[in-house]
Regions:
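Residue-level marker of positions within ordered structural domains that often coincide
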Residues: 3, 22, 105
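Bacterial N-terminal signal peptides
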Residues: 13-22
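Short, conserved micro-motifs composed of acidic
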Residues: 28-304
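Bacterial N-terminal signal peptides that target proteins for export
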Residues: 2-14
Length: 304
C-alpha cells in the first residue's frame, strides 16, 4: 500500500485502545520489541522508501520509492558485504509501481501497477478510499531469467478482476494472497487463490478476523502456518499489525502484536529470508520486526 497520512504519537495510546475494542482483536499476551531501524548502509530514504522484498539469498532487495505522485520499484545488490546504490528496476520507471514481492524460491517476482492491461490502453484508476481519482492497481509477474528478470506479465482476469487488486504475498506452493476492496461491505478484504496446474483457481476471502473490518498488506509464511497483516485500517483511521495462525482449514483470530510494535503505525509487512521476521514501514521509516516471541522455536536437527 502507499504511504498513508501520519498520526501524532500523542493520539496513539487512546486511539489504539479504542481500535482494539472496536475490531475485536486478541490483545498481546507476549512482549515484542519495536521494529529495529533498517537503512542498508544508508541507501534507503526514510521518508519515501518502503516495502522491502529480498531474494532468498538476501543479496538482492526490491523496494518502492515515492517521488511526488510517482512510485517506482528500485533494486539494489549487496556486494562484498556492502549495499550498492539502488537502480530503477528494469520493469519499472514509467507507471505507478509498488509493493514488490519475491516468491519463496526466488523464481519470480510480483508487483502492483496502474499500467494498462493491454498495449495502448489507459492506466488504471480507482476512487475507493482516497476521496477522488487515484492510481488503480493490478498484480503483475516477472520471471527470473538467468541472472536477470524477464518482462512483466499481467496476472490475468481471475485475480485482476477489479481496478484495485493489490499487495501480493505467496506461499511455497504458489497460493496467492492479496487485497481487494469489497464494494458491498465497504471494507478491504484479503483474498486467497490456490495455484494448480499453472493457473489460479477463483479467489476466496481468506477469512482473517471480522468480515466487517478491513485487512491490508498480508505477509504469509511459505507453509501458510502464520500470516502477518494490518487489521482495522479504514478511511482516515488506524490499523494494527497483527498475526494469525493456521488452525486446520481456517485462520485463527487476529492477535495484536502490541503497542511497542504498533507505535509507529507499521504497514506493508514482507517476510524476511529467515522466515521468522518481517520488514515493515512506519512513520519513521523501515524496520525489521522479529516474530520470535510469537513463533515456536525451529525444530532441532535430528541427532546423528
Amino acid at each position: 500500500m502507499s504511504r498513508t497520512l501520519s498520526h501524532t504519537t500523542a493520539r496513539l495510546g487512546l486511539a489504539a485502545g479504542l481500535l482494539l475494542a472496536a475490531i475485536g482483536v486478541r490483545a498481546a499476551t507476549r512482549v515484542a520489541a519495536a521494529p529495529q531501524a533498517v537503512t542498508l548502509d544508508g541507501i534507503l530514504h526514510a521518508d519515501n522508501d518502503d516495502t522491502l522484498a529480498f531474494t532468498p539469498d538476501g543479496d538482492t532487495v526490491f523496494f518502492d520509492r515515492s517521488e511526488g505522485k510517482r512510485k517506482t520499484i528500485m533494486v539494489a545488490q549487496r556486494r562484498h558485504g556492502h549495499w550498492m546504490p539502488p537502480q530503477v528496476a528494469a520493469f519499472s520507471g514509467t507507471w505507478f509501481d509498488q509493493d514488490p514481492l519475491v516468491a519463496p524460491d526466488g523464481s519470480y517476482l510480483l508487483f502492483n501497477s496502474d499500467r494498462p492491461v493491454r498495449p495502448g490502453g489507459q492506466p488504471l484508476v480507482q476512487d475507493y478510499f482516497v476521496g477522488g481519482r487515484a492510481p488503480g492497481s493490478n498484480i503483475w509477474r516477472v520471471n527470473r531469467e538467468g541472472r536477470g528478470w524477464g518482462k512483466p506479465v499481467w496476472l490475468g482476469p481471475v485475480i485482476n478482476n477489479d481496478v484495485f487488486v493489490d499487495f501480493a504475498s505467496v506461499a511455497a506452493d504458489g497460493t496467492l494472497y492479496f487485497i481487494r476492496f469489497d464494494a458491498k461491505a465497504r471494507v478491504m478484504h484479503t483474498w486467497r487463490a490456490r495455484y494448480r496446474d499453472g493457473a489460479y483457481l477463483p479467489p476466496q476471502r481468506a477469512g482473517l478476523g471480522d468480515p466487517d473490518v478491513s485487512t491490508h498488506d498480508p505477509a504469509v509464511a511459505p507453509d501458510e502456518s502464520f500470516i502477518v497483516f494490518d487489521y482495522g485500517k479504514v478511511k482516515g483511521g488506524l490499523g494494527r499489525l497483527c498475526i494469525a495462525f493456521r488452525e486446520g482449514a481456517h485462520w485463527g483470530w487476529p492477535i495484536d502484536l502490541g503497542d511497542a510494535v504498533n507505535r509507529d503505525l507499521p504497514w506493508g509487512a514482507h517476510l524476511a529470508p529467515d522466515g521468522r521476521s518481517v520488514y515493515v514501514t512506519g512513520n519513521a521509516g523501515i524496520g525489521r520486526l522479529s516474530l520470535a516471541p510469537w513463533l515456536r522455536p525451529p525444530a532441532a536437527a535430528p541427532a546423528r
